[in-house]
Amino acid sequence: MQLHLYNTLTRTKEVFNPQDHANVKMYVCGPTVYDNPHIGNSRSVVVYDLLYRIIIKIFGKKAVKYVRNITDIDDKIIDRAESLGININDLTNKVTREFHINMAYLGCMLPSIEPKATEHIDVMIEIIERLIAQDHAYITDNHVYFDVLSAPNYTELSNRNLEEMFEGVRIENSKTKKNPQDFVLWKPAKQNEPKNVNFSSPWGLGRPGWHIECSAMSYKYLGENFDIHGGGADLIFPHHTNEIAQSRCAFPSSTYAKYWIHNGFLTVNGEKMSKSLGNFITVRDLMDKQIQGEVVRLFLLSSHYRRPLDYNDKAIDDAKKTLDYWYRAIKEINVQKVDLPSDFMQSLFDDMNTPLAIKIINDYAKGVFISKTEAERKFNASAIITCANFIGLMRKTQYEWFNNDIDKLYINELINKRLKAKKQKNWLLADKIRNQLLEKKIILEDKSDCTTIWRKE
């Protein structure tokens, strides 16, 4: 059984054959930490979490290195910090913590390495210097730009001609560039900006462009060539297109990533998610509604990862009903560990066909209810748990699932928020949180050592 993945670069489904089976390398574009993650961001994380699990199953955990970056320097971050009147580091640290809480809620494993852009400025400068030395980049008006026309096969990933690619794309500082399509590698500091948003470089105080960050961090931890590069379909152009161009030009013998995997868009009630439309939904919003993380994870896996996925109340309700059905199917059965069924694994090995994998779990659940022998019931129930666990689901006992109206992660998050409020003598907020939990029949008990424990009424 071989893993097949759709490669955007070749536009074909290919057998996954890493360059070194003992050192499989995957890079995924992580969050820009300026605001709380929305469910569209989360789809990407859940998809590549599943791919990580599949690759570990094939090659072993020690053989797989999964790098997912944190972009913690960006114009959006600077603008957001200024609008909130807070230090940029306070903002990025806060949003990064929220991202980790959200991904734990969704049952995602941590990557092997999670580098921050601000901690890799030296590598970015090294690559930019290489590009300048090889006439792929130039300095003008205190900026460093990449010369797009110098890059061979620039349009290979997007499979569009150059004019089409840039239609409707906002191009800044076009008067100072050789070509309007050239993109920034390094930009100078602006007047009155906070000191901690800019860095020393051979071209003066400034900061990197967005695209160079991922090239630098993938090079640092995975080398010139690696196996998989993942991200949302919206990143194909310009971000991933520019990554390939600058990395291959900086390292002429490099092919950069071999397999390019892209997940589809997420809409809300048939419309593109947008703050202006008022349909912008964060993971925190779902947590506040006490929607269990497993429900959201199953919803995000319910459609094939390359297809669009629409968020709506019915889809979430359907995911909840499916999980209820699975948990009911294992009632009072002493489940045992069984091998992952071959048809289930075949579905995942076929370009992560999660709709088929979910159908197979449903078939095992049906099998429990129509089984004629206890041995058959036990096998079907065990297969449900084994398959669901593999894709990051059914991590609770049946009792926990049906008797926990509120997620433990969410309870502890509120308790920590309440403790912080008490330290700040914000008694109104502390009482509000206590009452909020009390409505869910959660009783708090403050201890003499300044900790708080909880129990269900």
Swiss-Prot record:
Enzyme Commission (EC) number: 6.1.1.16
Motif ('HIGH' region): 31-41
UniProt keyword annotations, A-Z: Aminoacyl-tRNA synthetase, ATP-binding, Cytoplasm, Ligase, Metal-binding, Nucleotide-binding, Protein biosynthesis, Zinc
Protein family membership: Belongs to the class-I aminoacyl-tRNA synthetase family.
Name of the featured protein: Cysteine--tRNA ligase
Cofactor(s) listed in the protein's UniProt record: Zn(2+)
Record SMART domains: DALR_2
Annotated residues for binding of Zn(2+): 29, 214, 239, 243
GO cellular component: cytosol
Cystines in this chain: none
SUPFAM superfamilies membership: Anticodon-binding domain of a subclass of class I aminoacyl-tRNA synthetases, Nucleotidylyl transferase
GO BP annotations listed: cysteinyl-tRNA aminoacylation
Catalytic activity of the protein: tRNA(Cys) + L-cysteine + ATP = L-cysteinyl-tRNA(Cys) + AMP + diphosphate
